[in-house]
Amino acid sequence: MYEQISPDTSHIRYEETDLSYLKLRPYRFKCGIYLICIQGKSIISTGVQQYAFDEQTELIFLTGSLIQIIQASADFKVRILLFPKDVFLKAILPIDTPYFNYVHEHPHYHHTADERSQNTWREIVLWMDVAQMLFKNNNTLLFRKQQELNFLQSILMWLFNTIPEKLAANKQYSRKQMLCHQFMQLIREHST
């Protein structure tokens, strides 16, 4: 049995858990949360959407979410990266708006058997290994704040590069949506 994870964090944290405490009731995460399933399977609900979450599956909520486990196998296990909103806002500045759009529309991804997808899976496991090395057990690193910012910015940029070009390029937006995206991009560019 694993300990319950705090719904918010002031620094990046890495955890491995079975999320069993999420079976009892929905749990609101106020921080960003990135999960990968390494064993077993479950159904995760956000109250609005349900996701089949099994081995080699990723789920990411950049600014938090309501999460509940609807059902899970006895061997269900995930690796989690939790990141505070303030670090996320600094890390995301150089990243374009289409990334937000894609992650908002597609927070769930199951890796397929093809070589590209399997390479991406191995790489995300490596990212989680680095997160474990740096951020497990609340290590007091000399340059922790800078390492958190660098790590989160790097993993977000890496994730952006894994987005299939066809999905990002073929999405048609209304004029109103395009103006909104351009406005948000201008805000991010000039907010520093």
Task: Indicate where each model-derived feature is located.
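A structure-centric signal for secondary-structure junctions around beta-strands
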Residues: 30-31, 75-77, 145
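Short, Lys/Arg-enriched, Trp-marked, Pro/Gly-tolerant hinge/linker segments that flank
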Residues: 113-118, 138-148, 159-192
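A conserved hydrophobic position in a structured secondary element of the catalytic/binding core
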Residues: 61-62, 83
